[in-house]
Curated annotation (Swiss-Prot):
Pfam families found in the cross-reference section: Ribosomal_L28 (PF00830)
InterPro entries noted in UniProt: Ribosomal_bL28, Ribosomal_bL28/bL31-like_sf, Ribosomal_bL28_bact-type, Ribosomal_bL28_sf
Gene Ontology MF annotations: structural constituent of ribosome
Family classification: Belongs to the bacterial ribosomal protein bL28 family.
PANTHER family linked: 39S RIBOSOMAL PROTEIN L28, MITOCHONDRIAL, LARGE RIBOSOMAL SUBUNIT PROTEIN BL28M
Keyword list, A-Z: Ribonucleoprotein, Ribosomal protein
Cellular component GO terms held in the UniProt record: cytosolic large ribosomal subunit
Protein name: Large ribosomal subunit protein bL28
Record-linked NCBIfam families: L28 (TIGR00009)
BP GO terms, sorted: translation
Region (Disordered): 1-24
Organism: Chromohalobacter salexigens (strain ATCC BAA-138 / DSM 3043 / CIP 106854 / NCIMB 13768 / 1H11)
Length: 78
């Protein structure tokens, strides 16, 4: 399963671990993703989304129905 938020589009980025002696080793910064079921009142069903913490806050603010319409406009299937 890909590490991409379905709401924000956040995905892993690369960077460095930096030790006290300034040695650098490559690493990945992965988004804080959770699989969550949301109740959609208009469709009378649950929708399962893989969202980041930021994506959950966006859903709380805008509402699940508006977020789903944005996802569907992008062409993603939900």
């Amino acid at each position: 399963m890909s590490q991409v938020c379905q709401v924000t589009g956040k995905r892993p980025v690369t960077g460095n671990n930096v030790s006290h002696s300034q040695r650098k080793t490559r690493r990945r910064f992965v988004p804080n993703l959770h699989t969550h079921r949301f109740w959609v009142e208009g469709e009378k069903r649950f929708v399962k989304l893989r969202v980041s913490s930021k994506g959950m806050r966006i859903i709380d603010k805008k509402g699940i129905e508006e977020v789903l319409s944005d996802i569907r406009k992008r062409g993603d299937r939900v």
